[in-house]
């Protein structure tokens, strides 16, 4: 015990009793003197050679800042209806229609976070599609999120339809002197929706039908059919029947999508009975199961999709659970045996040139993610979609050469 006390006193004397010599011996150095500039703030002192940093010349790191998709300009599109654009991203933070794991209401913010490395400042050339959509003829914006209730599904459907209609029923920034495919040969802007659960497609199709005036073909990437008749979940009334597994049934009943030119791809879910397939046929769908890629390959999958929709106007809907959970674990109803993110991107690129009127990516529930891999996969798919939309404007007989310096 005595030895410990003597050691403690020795250290104390070394640090304090020997003063300057002791401190210097232990490696302590005096700081350089600090001078206060004349008329400098009295609250702190600065070195005499201090210079202000010019932050306007510094490129913000890709991991910082407020996230928009691809660092696009955030525009209040719904409150400022005079704002024009060619392609907009809009968040739909709604997941009241989920039947299993909730959390897709946080999908829009997660997808924006996943797009940080795809941005206007650091470069965004889509090499396989040979285009940079952020440096082209198109004005791209991020319109933020639609304010939507989570307590009343019927009211939410009305809110989402109204907001989507307001976005697309305006003049675009470009091609205003061309003919388009909407009513009166009008060219309209296009919207990429960030879900949210898959129920959001019903109000989207309703709004699209109002402006295009014709049923639209649907390409639906998913592990589930989503054509359930009301009553499979819930009590069967409208408020209970509309959900992320039945919205296509309602769209078909309302006549707002094609009766014979829709297609699912990536299907692999168990079904309640074989009558589910009868309901699916009644909704105008054909099915490509996920396992078919083993025999058909990517080119075969692409051919079946293109043959089905033909030259129709097409709405593209992607449920992130079309991917295998190894590539996208953060979703509400994961199913094993899905496609890889590489396979999905290759299939998607095979659809370039189709007449896409809009698209969505849904069912990302980031609470279940690992290392952001689901958000990254979803953001990359959205990047491919917007690249195709820019590469192929939805106009009639346009001279694309003056708009597309690297278009092929």
Swiss-Prot record:
PROSITE patterns: ARGINASE_1, ARGINASE_2. One of its GO terms (molecular function) is metal ion binding. InterPro entries: Ureohydrolase (IPR006035), Ureohydrolase_dom_sf (IPR023696), Ureohydrolase_Mn_BS (IPR020855). Its cofactor is Mn(2+). Gene3D superfamilies: Ureohydrolase domain. Keywords: Hydrolase, Manganese, Metal-binding, Signal. Its EC number is 3.5.3.11. GO terms for biological process: putrescine biosynthetic process from arginine, via agmatine; urea metabolic process. Mn(2+) 2 binds at residues 222, 224, 319, 321. Mn(2+) 1 binds at residues 198, 222, 226, 319. The keyword Manganese applies. It catalyses: agmatine + H2O = urea + putrescine. It comes from the Eukaryota. Residues 1-21 form the signal peptide. Belongs to the arginase family. This is Putative agmatinase 3. It comes from Schizosaccharomyces pombe (strain 972 / ATCC 24843) (Fission yeast).
């Amino acid at each position: 015990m005595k030895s410990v006390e003597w050691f403690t006193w020795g250290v104390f004397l070394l640090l304090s009793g020997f003063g300057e010599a002791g401190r210097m011996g232990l490696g302590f150095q005096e700081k350089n003197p600090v001078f206060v500039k004349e008329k400098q703030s009295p609250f702190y002192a600065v070195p005499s050679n201090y210079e202000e940093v010019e932050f306007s010349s510094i490129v913000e790191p890709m991991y910082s800042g407020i996230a928009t998709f691809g660092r696009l300009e955030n525009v209040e599109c719904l409150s400022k209806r005079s704002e024009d654009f060619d392609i907009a991203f809009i968040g739909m933070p709604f997941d009241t229609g989920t039947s299993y794991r909730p959390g897709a209401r946080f999908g829009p913010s997660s997808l924006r976070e996943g797009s940080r490395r795809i941005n206007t400042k650091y470069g965004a050339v889509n090499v396989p599609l040979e285009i940079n959509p952020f440096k082209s003829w198109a004005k791209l914006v991020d319109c933020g999120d639609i304010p939507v209730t989570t307590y009343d599904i019927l009211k939410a459907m009305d809110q989402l339809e109204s907001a989507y209609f307001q976005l697309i029923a305006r003049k675009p920034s470009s091609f205003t002197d061309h003919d388009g495919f909407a009513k009166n040969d009008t060219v309209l802007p296009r919207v990429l929706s960030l879900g949210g659960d898959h129920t959001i497609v019903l109000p989207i199709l309703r709004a699209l039908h109002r402006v295009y005036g014709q049923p639209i073909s649907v390409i639906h990437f998913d592990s589930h059919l989503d054509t359930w008749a009301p009553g499979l979940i819930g009590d069967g009334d409208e408020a209970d029947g509309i959900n992320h597994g039945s919205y296509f049934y309602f769209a078909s009943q309302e006549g707002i999508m094609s009766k014979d030119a829709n297609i699912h791809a990536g299907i692999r879910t168990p079904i309640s009975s074989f009558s589910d397939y009868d309901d699916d046929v009644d909704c105008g769908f054909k099915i490509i199961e996920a396992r078919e890629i083993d025999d058909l390959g990517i080119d075969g999958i692409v051919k079946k999709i293109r043959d089905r929709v033909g030259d129709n106007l097409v709405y593209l809907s992607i449920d992130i659970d079309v991917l295998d959970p190894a590539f996208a674990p953060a979703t509400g109803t994961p199913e094993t045996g899905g496609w890889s993110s590489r396979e999905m991107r290759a299939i998607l690129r095979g659809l370039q040139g189709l007449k896409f009127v809009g698209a969505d990516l849904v069912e990302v529930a980031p609470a279940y993610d690992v290392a952001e891999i689901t958000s990254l996969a979803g953001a990359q798919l959205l990047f491919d979609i917007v690249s195709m939309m820019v590469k192929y404007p939805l106009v009639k007989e346009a001279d694309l050469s003056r708009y597309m310096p690297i278009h092929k």
